[in-house]
Amino acid sequence: MKQVITAKLKLHLSKEQKELLREVSLVYRNALNYASKVAFEKGKVSSANKLQKLIYQDIRSKFDLPSQMSCNVPRQVAATYKGLWTKLKQNAEHLQLGQTKKRYKGLDKPPKYLSRTCNLNYKRDYSFVKQEVSLITLQGRIKVPYSGYNKHIKLIKSGKNTVKFGGAKIYYARSTRTYYLLVSLELEIPNIEPDAINRVVSVDVGQRYHAVTTDTRNQTHFYSGKQCNRKATCYEKARKSLQQKGTRSAKRRLVSLSGRERRFVADQNHCLSKQIATPNTLIGLENLTNIRERTKPRKTGKKASIKQRKANHKQAKWSFAKLHSFIDYKAVLNNSLAIKVDADYTSQACPHCGYTSRGNRPNKGLVFHCESCGFKLHADLVAARNIAMRTLLTRQDWESTGSLSATPDGSSVEAKAARLSRFAELRWTAE
């Protein structure tokens, strides 16, 4: 099994070296904008090979970039256009289904690159030499000392024996005026066998409680999102005030505020995922694909009440996918595994008698009260228990069939119906 992580290395540059990196990053950015303009004029090209044939010689002559960086420019621009075309197609589908009235405008003009970054290839553009990293510039190579997270430094020093080096990116942090090197590291990790798993944990994510976890031994943890939500409200008020002012200094402040809020949310998710992804654990997550479309509010914008607008904003800021991705990669590094199970009816099904109804959770509140057997419990914990039972069933299938994704033959709809039918027979007895 392979797992890719990113090592963030702080570059300790002299004044001359800093100027050389500034020069190459600005020239690279200008080359990206030139390539973006050409791609737009030639029919919004999203093929890297086609774009490279159109602009490679121009980039070499006009911007004096090294050959490998001149190849990276059309690849990066083509990838951007490919993403924009995907969004345009999705928007067309949503317009046809009546899910939105807004036309996607991402391809109305060529995308502009503002960040001072450079994409580098291992050995051709950068390499590690003893305690330094060798970086390419327009004036030749420079050797720069670096620092970073101790685990990442150890992996880099161990060399090709334990890690495979991938692409890297030079990144400039304007707030601290510091250059960083973001290096992709591919780790070879032994395949996880069912016998190595000694614990099953389920995770129910939400907005009031960012995560509620439980296992088959009834060890339960509630991770409140109160502090994070309060902080998000403060950021929202500050952002609203600055947007109303509209001055140049207010816009600069908005940029820094956006970065700070993003880093705060990422830090919260990192800390939470670290506590959840314990060693030798099978972690069950809800499959929340297209959850925003399925839970789309009835009223948005000016038609919605103030209360509804606040709820809509809170839902839009909900970063459950990021939390899932953090749990996923941290689990692999800890000899654990995160899998996704169907999220259908996890908050409506009684784990004791199996009765499923919306009435079991009155007004979608915090209390689950079964209309059939009278079982009463915290609604998020009920959801976590249902996820745990589904995860345990998946593990049993894994042990018996040797396949982690054992599904009955038939269409995806039939397969899902069969899975939900099996889930309805599960009962929670670990009291």
Residue ranges and their predicted role:
Residues 1, 152-153, 193:
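Short aromatic-glycine motifs in intrinsically disordered, low-complexity regions
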Residues 1-73, 81, 89:
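Long, compositionally biased intrinsically disordered regions
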Residues 4-6, 19, 177-431:
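Positively charged, helix-rich recognition surfaces that bind polyanionic ligands
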Residues 12-18, 138-140, 147-149, 158, ...:
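Generic structural motif
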Residues 35, 72-84, 381-391:
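Stable alpha-helical structural segments in soluble proteins, enriched in small hydrophobic residues
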Residues 51-175, 225, 313, 317:
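Acidic carboxylate diad motif detector
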